[in-house]
Amino acid sequence: MPIIANDYTWEQSENDVYISVPLKGTKASASNVLCSESYLKVNFPPFLFEAFLFAPIDDSTSSAKIGNGVILFNLHKKEPAVWDALTLAHMEKEEMQKIRENAVAKEQEKAQEETKAKAERKRENEKYSLEVTMKIDEVERKRIEDVKEEERKKATEELEKWKEKQRIQKLNEMIQKKQIRQENERNKALHTGSLKHCSTATTVQNDRTINVKQKEKILPPTRSTGCIQIQFTPRVFPTALRESRVAEEEEWLHKQAEARRATNTVDLGLEDLTEEEKNPEWLKDKGNKLFAAGDYLAAVNALNLAIRLNNKIPGLYLNRSACHLKLRNLHKTIEDSSKALELLTPPVPGNASARIKAHVRRGTAFCELELYVEGLQDYEAALKIDPTNQNMKSDAEKIRRVIQSSLPDIERGIMLDIKDL
């Protein structure tokens, strides 16, 4: 049971009440204070101080300070007046208990309100943080959009420059063709005039000779001049006709022509593209430039669009396989190389170089995947097309040594060379 502390002092003014309660050696952290309109309690075990105030106070403006072993209360009266005493006298126990319970209930309600207010402040702070984050994201998004717009403008300017260059090139070609045609017509006219003049002069001279030597001997007339037209057989491939395979070459040319005419942007939903962007050859050139600049992913995107427009051109798959090889997409390299080899049929001298590249790239990808037997098969297929290529011979020999050797150090050394092919 606590000990009631009665050794307190108090004084008042018309508006305030000042109370001093000694803690009697108790630590300040061990004391508990409860203050309401009509009740004041200080619990500092084993002592207890409580006061049932003479009149109501404003607990929101009242204060308590702990220091030097004393608790000092500054209580602000609700109505200015001089109290007859600090506490009410002759109170019943039931009334005192009721005042205590009301004070505790109000303190709990006040604590709940403070908790709610704290939670509300926390929500406001989180809302403010979210708004600030959204503003930062909006600024970053705007910056990214500006960068994209700048890149789009640059690409548009490059495209316009390319169009102008193509227009000037076509104009120059037309002018050159016109000049060549005029020059040919002029030479033809001069040649025809020269033939007529020679024929007339010969006729006059012959007449004179006949008149002079008619008595001696009559000679036959001079043979008239003429032109023999020679037309050579048109040949797309540089090989001699006796060494070529005409049927296979014609089939290859026919397939190439059909592939160039196979573009259809309407069915693919690409009607919004410009005329240049609908041209697979233009996209192929764009991919080559991006590849040369080291932007392999952008080159793949350009070639993807070109293949969507026309999936019958082997050069698109061949170039994309090179990009995938640079990006270490080895399985895609194998797929594109295989597709290019399917389209590079029938095998003719005109597509020999492309077939060599397809075999070498697929073989390199197989070796990177440690499928050395399959890689060696592709290198040997490339050597059948060009048996004089010393680099491919050296690479094939290295792969054979990797297959035949079981030493890990040797294998690592050879793989390093294969990666540098």
Curated annotation (Swiss-Prot):
Pfam families in alphabetical order: CS
TPR repeat intervals: 280-313, 315-347, 356-389
Tree of life domain: Eukaryota
The keyword Repeat is annotated on this UniProt entry: yes
Major site of localization recorded for this protein: nucleus
Annotated segments matching region Disordered: 103-122
PROSITE patterns listed in its UniProt record: CS, TPR, TPR_REGION
GO MF, any single term: nuclear estrogen receptor binding
Ranges for domain CS: 3-87
Location of the protein in the cell: Nucleus; Cytoplasm; Cell projection, Neuron projection; Dynein axonemal particle
Keyword field contains ATP-binding: no
A GO CC annotation given for this chain: dynein axonemal particle
Sorted UniProt keywords: Cell projection, Coiled coil, Cytoplasm, Neurogenesis, Nucleus, Repeat, TPR repeat
A GO biological process held by the record: epithelial cilium movement involved in extracellular fluid movement
Its job: Axonemal dynein assembly factor required for ciliary motility.
Protein name from the UniProt record: Dynein axonemal assembly factor 4
Species, as recorded: Xenopus laevis
